[in-house]
Amino acid sequence: AGGRGAGAGLGYFALNPSQAPAVVRSTLSSVGLIEEGPPPTPTCPLTGLPAPHGQVPDRPVLAIKVENYPDARPQAGLSSADIVYEELVEGGITRFVVLYQCHDAPRVGPVRSARTADPDILAAFGRPILAYSGGAPNVVRVVNEADLIPIDETRGGDAFTRDPSRPAPHNLYAS
């Protein structure tokens, strides 16, 4: 039919082994056509960067809601995040959903309320932990019914602290 037989296809994989299906790679390797190298370096799933200490932490993604209102600045912990989402909440104000998988921050915040969009934003990350500070009753219901682990300041114990040098509500931090 198109002039390319099975040999032409296998020749392509011999020249481009990374494109070969696993079974073909194994067969090509066993006849010496592919040189096996060292195992790949573990990479952080959210960034594609090398994992710290050569190992991806075995834990769920941690998402923290962080305020972006001018009175809340400067925020803490954003530069250590693997991913930072900015979402419009109301009246031109935005909030961040800050994600950590391979990295940590000693302090993140100011932590603010959850929004109904948060479960949809986080759906791609398995069953993440969402750290937040309250929300409207319908929002809290949506968050509690979502496939995530919700933790607010009433359930988070020592993970949440208030900074007395900052005015409320811009003074709640997660660690």
Residue ranges and their predicted role:
Residues 3-25:
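Hydrophobic single-pass membrane-insertion segments
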Residues 20-83, 90-175:
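A surface/extracellular/periplasmic glyco- and lipid-processing/surface-interacting theme
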